[in-house]
Swiss-Prot record:
Molecular functions (GO terms): phosphoribosylanthranilate isomerase activity
Keywords assigned: Amino-acid biosynthesis, Aromatic amino acid biosynthesis, Isomerase, Tryptophan biosynthesis
Name of the protein in question: N-(5'-phosphoribosyl)anthranilate isomerase
NAD as UniProt keyword: no
Pfam families: PRAI (PF00697)
Organism: Desulfovibrio desulfuricans (strain ATCC 27774 / DSM 6949 / MB)
Protein backbone atom coordinates (compact mmCIF):
# COMPACT_ATOMS: atom_id res chain seq x y z
CA UNK A 1 0.00 0.00 0.00
CA UNK A 2 1.43 3.35 -1.07
CA UNK A 3 0.97 5.92 1.68
CA UNK A 4 1.40 9.59 0.87
CA UNK A 5 1.26 12.49 3.31
CA UNK A 6 0.71 15.77 1.50
CA UNK A 7 0.77 19.46 2.37
CA UNK A 8 3.94 19.18 4.45
CA UNK A 9 5.59 22.41 5.56
CA UNK A 10 7.59 21.50 8.68
CA UNK A 11 10.55 19.19 9.28
CA UNK A 12 8.89 17.73 12.37
CA UNK A 13 5.90 16.63 10.30
CA UNK A 14 8.09 15.13 7.55
CA UNK A 15 9.92 13.18 10.25
CA UNK A 16 6.60 11.97 11.69
CA UNK A 17 5.39 10.82 8.28
CA UNK A 18 8.59 8.84 7.76
CA UNK A 19 8.54 7.32 11.24
CA UNK A 20 4.93 6.17 10.82
CA UNK A 21 5.66 4.41 7.53
CA UNK A 22 4.72 6.84 4.77
CA UNK A 23 6.25 6.03 1.40
CA UNK A 24 5.67 9.44 -0.20
CA UNK A 25 5.76 13.02 1.09
CA UNK A 26 4.05 15.88 -0.72
CA UNK A 27 4.94 19.57 -1.00
CA UNK A 28 2.54 22.07 -2.54
CA UNK A 29 3.79 24.74 -4.94
CA UNK A 30 0.55 26.67 -5.48
CA UNK A 31 0.80 30.24 -4.13
CA UNK A 32 -2.84 30.52 -3.04
CA UNK A 33 -2.68 27.34 -0.95
CA UNK A 34 -2.22 27.81 2.81
CA UNK A 35 0.15 24.84 2.59
CA UNK A 36 2.35 26.36 -0.12
CA UNK A 37 6.12 26.13 0.28
CA UNK A 38 8.93 27.59 -1.79
CA UNK A 39 11.38 25.34 -3.63
CA UNK A 40 14.10 26.42 -1.21
CA UNK A 41 11.94 25.57 1.79
CA UNK A 42 11.03 22.16 0.35
CA UNK A 43 14.67 21.41 -0.45
CA UNK A 44 15.58 22.07 3.18
CA UNK A 45 13.12 19.43 4.45
CA UNK A 46 14.95 16.10 4.72
CA UNK A 47 12.75 13.13 3.85
CA UNK A 48 14.90 10.01 4.11
CA UNK A 49 13.78 7.21 1.80
CA UNK A 50 10.32 8.63 1.08
CA UNK A 51 9.58 9.65 -2.50
CA UNK A 52 9.37 13.43 -2.72
CA UNK A 53 6.31 14.70 -4.61
CA UNK A 54 5.60 18.25 -5.75
CA UNK A 55 2.02 19.40 -6.30
CA UNK A 56 1.68 21.73 -9.29
CA UNK A 57 -1.45 23.58 -10.41
CA UNK A 58 -0.58 26.40 -12.80
CA UNK A 59 3.06 25.74 -13.77
CA UNK A 60 4.12 24.60 -17.24
CA UNK A 61 6.58 21.79 -17.91
CA UNK A 62 9.64 24.03 -17.88
CA UNK A 63 8.72 25.57 -14.53
CA UNK A 64 7.82 22.18 -13.07
CA UNK A 65 11.18 20.72 -14.07
CA UNK A 66 13.02 23.72 -12.64
CA UNK A 67 11.23 23.42 -9.30
CA UNK A 68 11.71 19.66 -9.23
CA UNK A 69 15.46 20.09 -9.57
CA UNK A 70 15.64 22.89 -7.00
CA UNK A 71 13.42 21.15 -4.45
CA UNK A 72 14.98 17.70 -4.98
CA UNK A 73 11.69 16.13 -6.07
CA UNK A 74 11.17 12.63 -7.42
CA UNK A 75 7.66 13.09 -8.80
CA UNK A 76 5.28 15.80 -9.99
CA UNK A 77 1.59 15.64 -9.09
CA UNK A 78 -0.23 17.50 -11.87
CA UNK A 79 -3.21 19.08 -10.18
CA UNK A 80 -4.24 21.62 -12.81
CA UNK A 81 -4.87 21.86 -16.52
CA UNK A 82 -1.52 20.43 -17.59
CA UNK A 83 -2.12 18.17 -20.60
CA UNK A 84 -0.50 14.89 -21.62
CA UNK A 85 2.16 16.73 -23.61
CA UNK A 86 3.19 18.60 -20.46
CA UNK A 87 3.32 15.33 -18.54
CA UNK A 88 5.54 13.74 -21.16
CA UNK A 89 7.84 16.76 -21.12
CA UNK A 90 8.21 16.34 -17.35
CA UNK A 91 8.66 12.58 -17.80
CA UNK A 92 5.74 10.18 -17.68
CA UNK A 93 7.33 7.97 -15.01
CA UNK A 94 7.71 11.03 -12.79
CA UNK A 95 4.05 12.10 -13.03
CA UNK A 96 1.07 11.54 -10.75
CA UNK A 97 -2.05 12.60 -12.67
CA UNK A 98 -4.91 13.96 -10.58
CA UNK A 99 -8.41 12.97 -11.70
CA UNK A 100 -11.71 14.17 -10.19
CA UNK A 101 -14.31 11.36 -10.60
CA UNK A 102 -17.19 13.71 -9.71
CA UNK A 103 -16.70 15.42 -13.08
CA UNK A 104 -17.95 12.31 -14.87
CA UNK A 105 -21.58 11.23 -14.84
CA UNK A 106 -20.76 7.65 -15.81
CA UNK A 107 -17.97 5.24 -14.93
CA UNK A 108 -17.25 4.72 -18.63
CA UNK A 109 -16.38 8.41 -18.98
CA UNK A 110 -14.05 8.19 -15.98
CA UNK A 111 -12.42 5.10 -17.46
CA UNK A 112 -11.92 6.92 -20.76
CA UNK A 113 -10.19 9.77 -18.92
CA UNK A 114 -7.89 7.31 -17.18
CA UNK A 115 -7.05 5.73 -20.52
CA UNK A 116 -6.35 9.15 -22.06
CA UNK A 117 -3.54 9.72 -19.56
CA UNK A 118 -2.28 6.14 -19.21
CA UNK A 119 0.86 6.66 -21.28
CA UNK A 120 1.66 10.01 -19.67
CA UNK A 121 1.82 9.14 -15.97
CA UNK A 122 3.11 6.58 -13.50
CA UNK A 123 -0.07 6.58 -11.45
CA UNK A 124 -3.26 8.49 -10.75
CA UNK A 125 -4.59 10.29 -7.71
CA UNK A 126 -8.38 10.32 -7.52
CA UNK A 127 -9.55 13.32 -5.51
CA UNK A 128 -12.90 14.61 -4.26
CA UNK A 129 -14.76 17.60 -5.64
CA UNK A 130 -14.39 19.08 -9.11
CA UNK A 131 -10.99 20.77 -8.72
CA UNK A 132 -8.42 21.77 -6.12
CA UNK A 133 -7.52 19.65 -3.12
CA UNK A 134 -7.04 19.63 0.64
CA UNK A 135 -10.68 20.58 1.19
CA UNK A 136 -11.58 17.58 3.33
CA UNK A 137 -14.44 16.63 0.97
CA UNK A 138 -14.86 12.87 0.55
CA UNK A 139 -15.44 10.82 -2.59
CA UNK A 140 -18.27 8.32 -2.95
CA UNK A 141 -15.97 5.35 -2.45
CA UNK A 142 -18.39 2.70 -3.69
CA UNK A 143 -18.42 4.36 -7.12
CA UNK A 144 -14.74 3.42 -7.40
CA UNK A 145 -15.16 -0.25 -6.48
CA UNK A 146 -13.52 -2.55 -9.05
CA UNK A 147 -12.32 0.44 -11.06
CA UNK A 148 -10.45 -0.95 -14.12
CA UNK A 149 -7.55 1.47 -13.87
CA UNK A 150 -4.66 1.01 -16.33
CA UNK A 151 -2.23 2.43 -13.76
CA UNK A 152 -1.90 2.22 -9.97
CA UNK A 153 -4.05 4.81 -8.23
CA UNK A 154 -4.15 6.63 -4.92
CA UNK A 155 -7.33 7.62 -3.12
CA UNK A 156 -7.55 11.15 -1.67
CA UNK A 157 -10.23 13.39 -0.23
CA UNK A 158 -10.71 13.97 3.51
CA UNK A 159 -9.12 10.70 4.62
CA UNK A 160 -8.46 10.23 8.33
CA UNK A 161 -8.11 7.47 10.91
CA UNK A 162 -11.89 7.53 11.33
CA UNK A 163 -12.76 6.79 7.71
CA UNK A 164 -9.78 5.33 5.85
CA UNK A 165 -10.57 1.77 6.90
CA UNK A 166 -14.11 2.08 5.55
CA UNK A 167 -12.82 3.74 2.39
CA UNK A 168 -10.43 0.87 1.72
CA UNK A 169 -13.19 -1.67 2.29
CA UNK A 170 -15.42 0.06 -0.26
CA UNK A 171 -12.85 0.39 -3.04
CA UNK A 172 -9.43 -1.04 -3.79
CA UNK A 173 -6.85 1.70 -4.33
CA UNK A 174 -3.16 0.99 -4.56
CA UNK A 175 -2.47 3.81 -2.14
CA UNK A 176 -3.92 6.60 -0.04
CA UNK A 177 -3.15 10.29 0.33
CA UNK A 178 -3.58 12.05 3.68
CA UNK A 179 -3.71 15.81 4.12
CA UNK A 180 -6.44 17.78 5.86
CA UNK A 181 -7.74 14.76 7.79
CA UNK A 182 -4.52 14.54 9.82
CA UNK A 183 -4.08 18.25 10.58
CA UNK A 184 -4.72 20.73 13.36
CA UNK A 185 -4.49 23.57 10.83
CA UNK A 186 -3.41 23.80 7.18
CA UNK A 187 0.20 22.66 6.95
CA UNK A 188 0.33 21.61 10.61
CA UNK A 189 0.00 17.86 11.03
CA UNK A 190 -1.26 16.32 14.27
CA UNK A 191 1.02 13.51 15.44
CA UNK A 192 -1.78 11.44 16.98
CA UNK A 193 -4.07 11.78 13.96
CA UNK A 194 -1.24 10.96 11.58
CA UNK A 195 -0.09 7.93 13.55
CA UNK A 196 -3.61 6.54 13.82
CA UNK A 197 -4.42 7.06 10.13
CA UNK A 198 -1.19 5.53 8.87
CA UNK A 199 -1.57 2.56 11.21
CA UNK A 200 -4.92 1.71 9.62
CA UNK A 201 -3.63 2.20 6.08
CA UNK A 202 -0.48 0.18 6.69
CA UNK A 203 -2.56 -2.92 7.47
CA UNK A 204 -3.91 -2.96 3.93
CA UNK A 205 -2.18 -4.53 0.96
CA UNK A 206 -2.09 -2.59 -2.28
CA UNK A 207 -2.49 -4.36 -5.59
CA UNK A 208 0.33 -2.66 -7.49
CA UNK A 209 3.39 -0.56 -6.81
CA UNK A 210 5.22 2.11 -8.71
CA UNK A 211 7.98 0.69 -10.89
Amino acid sequence: MLIKVCGLTRQADVDLAASFGASMCGFIFHPVSPRCVSPVQAASLESGSMLRVGVFVEQDAEEICRIMAEARLDMAQLHGRQDAACARAVGAQRVIRVIWPARYCHRALLYNELQNHADACACYLLDAGLAGGGSGVRLDWEDLNHLPSPRPWLLAGGLSAENVGLALSRCSPDGVDFNSGVEDAPGQKNAQKLAAALAVAAKQKGNRYLS
